[in-house]
């Protein structure tokens, strides 16, 4: 399966195009079929406000256009601003999936599945209210078992994170939401902030509600993590 943005109408940026899933079914050493289908989110055919009247985000308003994963028997189309959308093996959209009501914020488009435990690790960000970032963990059966806040000083754009055998790594970097720009409609509201700083957060996987240790780094921005692993008493993070 492949997911990506496909604008249906003129737009300022193709990243905001609606998600389209492309699939190839392999059987007996042959491709039995290829098909592509829109991810028909609640906002695909209807106008859904991005924010609710109380200022919280409408998590069902989604383009679901960035990634697609399979975990615990469910196939999920992802975009970091919204809830995941479940699709079938025939690429039909089932609907928004909130882990049986336990997920109350967005889900990153770059979750990590532990190859040893089968756990799904992910986070959500984007709320203008605290906590701005929340870490989540679902077990191998798909039950959401952990929701905990990640303390960051402002609404940072945390696009990706990293997972090692023993740790979860968070990237608190200086691309930050600017509410004034958003209210005035002056383009992309996430901007570089010279005063914000940059740091990496380290959380032990065996103590998921424990302290997150923060380490200051040179200001930068990381879109994607390539690899991360534990190396004796150190942690190695490779990113772009």
Annotate each predicted stretch with a short phrase.
Residues 1-240:
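Beta-propeller domains
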